[in-house]
Amino acid sequence: YDVVFASFSLGTPDLRGAIEKMNEACSGTVAVFHFAGLPYWEQIMLDLWPDLHGVPYLPGPKAEIIFNLLYRMGIYPDVSVSSYEHRLTVPDLDAGVDALRGRLLVETPEQEGILRRYLAARLIPGGDGLVLGHRVHRACLRWEPHRPGGGLRAV
């Protein structure tokens, strides 16, 4: 393939294997898009998981893990980072609780109360309801895996 890419999909136990497969399949450019910081839902999980479930939340790998693995593999990608303000908009507090209940595995009234208090302290009026804003950073790592004469080089 001329271009092989993965978009926010490398939360795999065998990251090296996934990268090797992309390199093998690509005759042009490999591009990996991944978070360079916490997305809003992971920030909420990091904040609430201990209170909800009694254990810390362990976020998945981010772009720096992918970069470091590529570096150890002898791949030196071009890296670009962009950011935007993610806005979770809900009509009211109840809808906010409902929107996050499943992701946070909220099952009991006590857990719902924890989530409700968290959102009540953070949702702000805006637009068509209540808004939870969060700055999201994304990275693009690009490289050319195959070159005549051997070796790997960034694009």
Language-model segments: which ranges?
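Short alpha-helix
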Residues: 57-80
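A short, conserved alpha-helix within the catalytic core of class I
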Residues: 10-27
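Acceptor-substrate binding/catalytic loop of class I
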Residues: 51-63, 104-106
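Conserved beta-strand signature within the Rossmann-like core of class I S-adenosyl-L-methionine
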Residues: 26-40
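A conserved beta-strand element that flanks and buttresses the S-adenosyl-L-methionine
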Residues: 4-5
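Short, glycine-/aromatic-enriched active-site segment of Class I SAM-dependent methyltransferases
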Residues: 36-56
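Conserved Class I S-adenosyl-L-methionine
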Residues: 73-155
